[in-house]
Amino acid sequence: MFTAKNPFEDIVLKATSDELTSENWELNLEVCDKVSSGGDTAARNCIAAIQKRLVHRNANVQLYALTLADAVAKNCGLAAHQEIASRSFTQTLARICLDRNTHSTVKKRCSALVKEWAGEFDDQSLGLMKETYESLKSQDAVAEDETPAEPPREPTSEQLRAEDEELRRALELSIQDQGGRNAWPSYNTEQAETSGSSAPAAASSSSSAYQPTSQSLAPAQQQQQQQHDANHTNGTSSSAHAQPLSAATPPAVASRVRALYDFSPTEPGELAFSRGEVIRVLDSVYEHWWRGEVRGEAGIFPVNYVEVLPDPTPDELQREAQMEARIFSQAADIDRLLSKLRSLDPARDNLADDDELQELYQKSLAMRPKIVKLIDRYSNKITELKAMNDKFVHARGSFDEMMEQSLSRYNPGGHSSQDYLRPRPELQQHFSASSADYAQHPSYPTAHAYSVQQAQSASSAHDQIQYPFNPEQRHGYAQSAGAEPADPSYVQGSRLPSGPQPPQQITMAHQQQPHEQQYSSAPHDDEKRRLFERARAESEAFQQQHFQSQAHTSRSGYSGAYPSQPDASVLNQQMGNMNIGGSSSYASHPTGH
């Protein structure tokens, strides 16, 4: 009623386990020993256990079972051959070879063993194996014979001797040609610096310089060297032709990759990511490490942890946009489903019979994966935008701090940095137009007027010395009454007689250098421009009023001496009332002659 357990089942199970990485020949030989010592019954039990493993779904288990059957066939004699050639076992082999779900490697191995066993089993009682082979062959289930590759021929002694001779010559040439052919010109140059008179002859031609020791070589070696030179020249030219082609087609660098595994950084500067995240590639630093960014963090990551994502084509982008529009257009179906569910009562209404409800539910259910995909996409965009905003805030804070430090160092007491940090759309949108308008502003001299002013200043140098304006006074340093001018030419020129000077030229001479400084440092924003124009207008009005009255006094009482200078204290008081720049450029005490 109950059948006894097969004694070979456990050992065959171990020998064909799916946990093995290769054939366990120790167990295979142990099975063969048990079959040889057990007789016909042992052979029958062993082949039955192997037959169970042949129908396993794991391809590795099937391969291990076929290997074990082949070992039993080769080591256990006629009793094992009869069991292998039985109808039950041969039908199992044929089923493996003809099954479409069987792995191709298992099919090839099984058909090869059937062919091998059909040729080895020459006993009349084993004819079923030959019939199985013929049947499989008629159904094209047996792999065709592959012509074995010819084994490499053993080199003869003459070939070995010739190779040794060529190697010896190559070594001699390499010793003589140290640094390669391209190193000989530099070698000759170094010898030219040290040897003196022998250098010109050595450097007269590169061909003669390349063969300094060719005369000492044997004729065969000279011929070998010439062939080596020709081959090197051809190789250089071919590589030169091939170089533009390789440079024209640089390897493409991926722009996006997807993480295949979780990566936890072990060193500072590495990028951490989780499986499935899309990483934006910033640079391919090394062959196996790239630099990327994800969730606002940047760092390097191993290439074998990710897979390259191709850039989306215009068609794909269009399809995604259409799918997104379709999802938003179908959002009304979800609202209809919710409103309909609120109006139904499961206690009194049969929901299964409501076709409209079922249709709305199926439509909403089909939208679910698309909505999740859109959520993931927009979540990534939100993360990137937040990271971009954080970077901008950091950059803006750094810029504000550096601008404050720069203004406090190079422009103390000037305007605040807020004047520079205020956004100016007119400069961003109409930069070229505002620049042209600023250049043509009537309150600033044009290039032509400025050159005319320079020419007038140079031509009226003799008239300008009538008014003894000391440049040091312009910078706030008064000259003492008894001090002599340091420049002799200035003393000589100041004593030359001259006629009275017009007030316009006096004003121009007095303002020449300050105006140049003001023009060279013209402001570039509206507020500073208005302040500049106001200060300039007030300064011109004051100077015209003062110097006209002073010139009138000097013309009425002219006696050939210097005209009287204006009182510096009065000028400082008047300039302080106007509050131009917060300080005066005149001396704090009167000067004398």
Curated annotation (Swiss-Prot):
Matching Gene3D superfamilies: 1.20.5.1940, 1.25.40.90, SH3 Domains
Chief location of this protein within or outside the cell: membrane
Record's keyword annotation contains Nucleotide-binding: no
Domain SH3: 252-311
GO biological process assignments: protein transport to vacuole involved in ubiquitin-dependent protein catabolic process via the multivesicular body sorting pathway
Keyword vocabulary terms for this entry: Endosome, Membrane, Protein transport, SH3 domain, Transport
Residue ranges, compositional bias (Low complexity): 194-227, 540-552
InterPro entries named in the record: ENTH_VHS, GAT_dom, SH3-like_dom_sf, SH3_domain, STAM, VHS_dom
Chain intervals with Polar residues compositional bias: 175-193, 232-241, 504-521, 566-593
Biased amino acid composition, Basic and acidic residues: 151-171, 523-539
Listed GO MF terms: phosphatidylinositol binding; ubiquitin binding
Ranges of residues in domain UIM: 162-181
Family annotation (SMART domains): SH3, VHS
Subunit-structure text: Component of the ESCRT-0 complex composed of HSE1 and VPS27.
Function per UniProt: Component of the ESCRT-0 complex which is the sorting receptor for ubiquitinated cargo proteins at the multivesicular body (MVB).
PANTHER family for the chain: JAK PATHWAY SIGNAL TRANSDUCTION ADAPTOR MOLECULE (PTHR45929:SF3)
Name of the protein in question: Class E vacuolar protein-sorting machinery protein HSE1
Species this chain originates from: Mycosarcoma maydis
Gene giving rise to this polypeptide: HSE1
